[in-house]
């Protein structure tokens, strides 16, 4: 199979898989909006940064270890076998604080995220359940990354889609027929990665599998080597959490809970958009790492060009759909028919999503830099878009233009990052 055909196979399957992951957040938002109105949407938006932090750690461990594994395997290095078990062990270590927070102090965590008394009272049960399932969220990221890098992207896609479908169906069953409310939504979301891991585990019984569990203690050295390549994935996932936290605080100050609920609508659709571009980057990563391990620089550059072109085309298609149907798209999560929330979300969607013309390229380029063992440049791109530029732009533009300035911070920061990314790519290429 030609490199181009492999690229489209890996990328398309990975996009579908990650779209499935983002869809269970959308399902949560929809059912919670039906059950609890704008307060429920505001609660979920306050919880999104916690989800992002959990996924970020899973991404750093999974993508970093799997990338290191793919490079070493392409070079015939037997040390590649140790990275899978090590990543799983460290996931259990990193998950422990989240589990303890879920048991002992979920209300403290919700207050820290900006929740008022109403939101905290509403969300304690929801937060407690999903925090207790943190190990499964992290390990799911690791298992799917290794299955994908071991030449089985189809199974990784099927596992993710099945987990997401379970979440959507049981969100409804747990919340309404069974009457569990918000804790039911959390339970459906929490069990979803358990099912995905079980399906992915089939890969390890195939004769073609080269991924093995190795009896070992957690190795700080292997962790550092993995995180070196996974830190851009960590920052990339965290960028959503940082953006959500900063925007929540600014919007609370500017217009209160209704503005936060409006941003909840924007943020949930943004999760879907980001999943699409992460699908391009993560789908190309095994092929780029394989080319790099075999010293095929031309192949790696070809994949970068394919990824950048794909990202631009997808951004244009995404914005065209959003611009044409902004009203109905916003109305899906506006169960109370709040005119003010609809007004805020309508303008927010149209301004915010301009950023994906730049963000798609930045995500693909950061994935490429990590896949070819250039972690410093990958981290610089991810840090710029995820923390430095977005925080600076949101503070400055909100002071100048109010709520529209908050929405404009995302496209402005991504445009700045795109300039930095082009400089980093051209410096060595």
Describe the residue ranges of each PLM region:
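Short runs within selected transmembrane alpha-helices of multi-pass transporters and secretion channels
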Residues: 62, 129-148, 156-167, 185-200, ...
């Amino acid at each position: 199979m030609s490199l181009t055909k492999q690229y489209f196979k890996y990328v398309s399957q990975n996009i579908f898989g990650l779209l499935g992951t983002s869809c269970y957040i959308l399902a949560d938002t929809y059912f919670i909006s039906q059950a609890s109105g704008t307060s429920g949407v505001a609660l979920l938006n306050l919880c999104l940064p916690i989800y992002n932090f959990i996924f970020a750690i899973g991404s750093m461990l999974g993508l970093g270890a799997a990338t290191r594994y793919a490079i070493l395997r392409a070079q015939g290095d037997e040390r590649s076998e140790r990275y899978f078990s090590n990543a799983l062990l460290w996931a259990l270590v990193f998950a422990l604080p989240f589990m303890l927070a879920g048991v002992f102090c979920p209300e403290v965590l919700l207050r820290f995220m900006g929740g008022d008394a109403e939101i905290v009272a509403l969300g304690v049960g929801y937060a407690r359940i999903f925090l207790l399932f943190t190990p499964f969220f992290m390990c799911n990221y690791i298992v799917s990354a290794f299955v994908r890098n071991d030449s089985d992207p189809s199974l990784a896609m099927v596992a993710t889609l099945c987990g997401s479908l379970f979440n959507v169906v049981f969100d409804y069953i747990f919340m309404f027929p069974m009457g569990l409310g918000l804790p039911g939504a959390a339970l459906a979301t929490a069990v979803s990665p358990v099912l995905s891991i079980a399906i992915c585990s089939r890969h390890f019984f195939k004769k073609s599998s080269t991924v093995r569990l190795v009896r070992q203690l957690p190795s700080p050295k292997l962790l550092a080597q993995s995180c070196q390549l996974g830190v851009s994935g960590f920052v990339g996932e965290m960028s959503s959490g940082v953006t959500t936290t900063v925007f929540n605080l600014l919007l609370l100050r500017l217009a209160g809970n209704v503005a936060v609920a409006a941003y909840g609508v924007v943020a949930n659709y943004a999760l879907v958009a980001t999943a699409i571009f992460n699908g391009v980057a993560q789908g190309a990563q095994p092929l780029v790492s394989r080319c790099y391990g075999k010293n095929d620089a031309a192949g790696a550059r070809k994949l970068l060009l394919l990824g950048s072109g794909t990202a631009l085309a997808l951004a244009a298609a995404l914005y065209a759909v959003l611009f044409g149907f902004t009203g109905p798209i916003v109305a899906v999560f506006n169960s109370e028919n709040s005119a003010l929330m609809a007004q805020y979300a309508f303008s927010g969607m149209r301004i915010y999503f301009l950023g994906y013309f730049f963000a798609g390229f930045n995500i693909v380029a950061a994935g490429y830099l990590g896949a070819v063992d250039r972690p410093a440049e990958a981290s610089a791109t991810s840090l710029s878009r995820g923390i430095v530029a977005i925080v600076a732009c949101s503070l400055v533009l909100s002071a100048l233009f109010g709520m529209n300035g908050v929405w404009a911070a995302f496209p402005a920061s991504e445009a700045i990052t795109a300039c930095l990314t082009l400089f980093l790519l051209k410096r060595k290429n």
